[in-house]
């Protein structure tokens, strides 16, 4: 099954005031026990195109493997008040495999000029995905943006805390 996400689906997690939005930000290809994310290239204003993201209620680790393109996998762990406690970014290139721990939030960001294609090893039921903190705060603690041709991080003003960004 193929699901296409539209600019309307993504608007609630983008920086406030964004006008130019990628029409079809990403697609999901679901089959048996896996999902392929196909994230379109482009920008939503100055923010790189991304997936909506979610916090995982899945009891185990999830494996993400980049099949094509380049981008960033964002991971965030919140405290009990839904404030960011840890923020980690992992650079994605073809064949890169990333494990996302239980209870962490994740989002895929396409920083390249081609599609970003990423495989997840599990199909999650709606009960396994918690989007509420992301929707309430319009995204994760930082937005991934382009400034002067470089990848940069802009603080999301809806968070009180902005932890140090760690990379992998």
What are these regions (language model features)?
Residues 96-98, 102-107:
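Histidine-centered metal-chelating micro-motifs
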Residues 1-91, 109-168:
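Active-site region of the double-stranded beta-helix
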């Amino acid at each position: 099954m193929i699901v296409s996400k539209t600019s309307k689906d993504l608007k609630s997690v983008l920086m406030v005031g964004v006008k130019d939005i990628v029409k079809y930000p990403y697609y999901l290809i679901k089959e048996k026990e896996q999902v392929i994310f196909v994230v379109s290239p482009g920008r939503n204003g100055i923010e790189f195109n991304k997936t909506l993201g979610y916090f995982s209620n899945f009891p185990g680790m999830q494996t993400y493997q980049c099949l094509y393109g380049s981008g960033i996998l964002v991971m965030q762990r919140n405290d009990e008040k839904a404030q960011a406690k840890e923020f980690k970014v992992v650079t994605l290139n073809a064949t890169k495999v990333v494990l996302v721990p239980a209870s962490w939030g994740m989002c895929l960001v396409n920083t390249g000029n081609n599609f970003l294609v990423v495989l997840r090893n599990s199909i999650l039921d709606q009960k396994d995905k918690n989007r509420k903190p992301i929707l309430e705060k319009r995204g994760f603690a930082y937005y991934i943006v382009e400034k002067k041709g470089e990848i940069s991080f802009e603080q999301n003003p809806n968070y009180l805390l902005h932890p140090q960004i760690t990379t992998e």
